[in-house]
Amino acid sequence: MRRLTAIPGVLLIAVAAAMWGTDPIIRKTMSGTTSATTIVFGEHVILVLLTLPLLLPALRAVFRAGWRYVGAAVVIGAGASAVATILFTDALIGHSDFITPVVIQKVQPLVAVAAAALLLAERPRPGFWWLFLPALAGFWLVNQPHPFDPSAQGWVVIAEATAAAVLWALGTVLGRYMSRELEFQHVLSLRFFFGLIACAIALPIMGAPAYSNGHDTSLILYLALVTGLVALTLYYYGLQRTPAVLSSLSELTYPAVAVIAGIYAYDQHLAWTQWLGVALILGSVTLLPFRRRRVVAEAPRELLPAAASA
């Protein structure tokens, strides 16, 4: 972990988000064979088992921090980790539309900016919009091959994906909030633990089995290890020293990579406008570490995150 301290937090978050970009295709592969709730429950079982040694110290730390931090942990786990992932997975595997659920994730920064202002006293400076607006335009270009003739299919897909985006954005802000008192590995462990409880409750409600078939279980294992444990470790390690406003912007690499991966997976080709969109996104994210002080007004010094032990 010490080697990661030399890497700007926003870049670690961008790398984690890019790893999440492979996630939708894997979930889409299980369409018709495994329910969304079963998939997400399986992920959380694996993740809790892998982080079990961290659980008791994490629980002690969060209860010592106070009820607000306990509430934040529950919302991150049950809301962002469990419910949001179930909704997003269902939007992918329960419908024929692959692109729309991914496209809608670009609303996350808007939610995160508002929540960060309310909860963390982070204020975007004028410089933020000089990076955010080109990134937003880039997403529009990447996600719409015909940018002046856009399309969106299915209100159910839109509703599920939008709810997931809001919950994930709130999870980003609350994760930053928790990092004021807890180390990143404790936030990670609590996310999985409360997420597993929520998934276990969702199984009987949705009438979903706890286990699928052997083939899909191997895919769930990949999701848990790569886009789950590894990506989220990088994410929370970077988030402890990155304002939530900047984090939400760097997370936009996720839908960009997901759309591009989906296009190639389904034997499609990028138009020149889509490549322009990719360039705008990469440019905005790359400039973040160098423009940080001009982009966001951060919280007072006494509210900065707890130092990592690694």
What does each model-identified segment do?
Residues 1-41, 78, 86-87, 150-177, ...:
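Glycine-/small-residue-enriched transmembrane alpha-helix faces in small-molecule transporters
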Residues 5-9, 33-41, 63-71, 144-167, ...:
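Juxtamembrane helix-entry segments on the extracytoplasmic side of multipass membrane proteins
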Residues 17, 39-42, 101-107, 174-196, ...:
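Helix-helix packing/entry segments at the starts of transmembrane helices
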Residues 23, 58-99, 105, 141, ...:
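Specific transmembrane alpha-helical segments of multi-pass solute transporters/efflux pumps
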Residues 30, 39, 43, 91-92, ...:
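Hydrophobic/aromatic residues within transmembrane alpha-helices
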Residues 32-83, 109-116, 166-171, 188-207, ...:
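Transmembrane alpha-helices of multi-pass small-molecule transport proteins
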Residues 51, 115, 127-146, 197-199, ...:
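Hydrophobic transmembrane alpha-helices of multi-pass small-molecule transport proteins
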Residues 102-105, 121-141, 151-157, 213-214, ...:
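Loop-to-transmembrane alpha-helix entry segments
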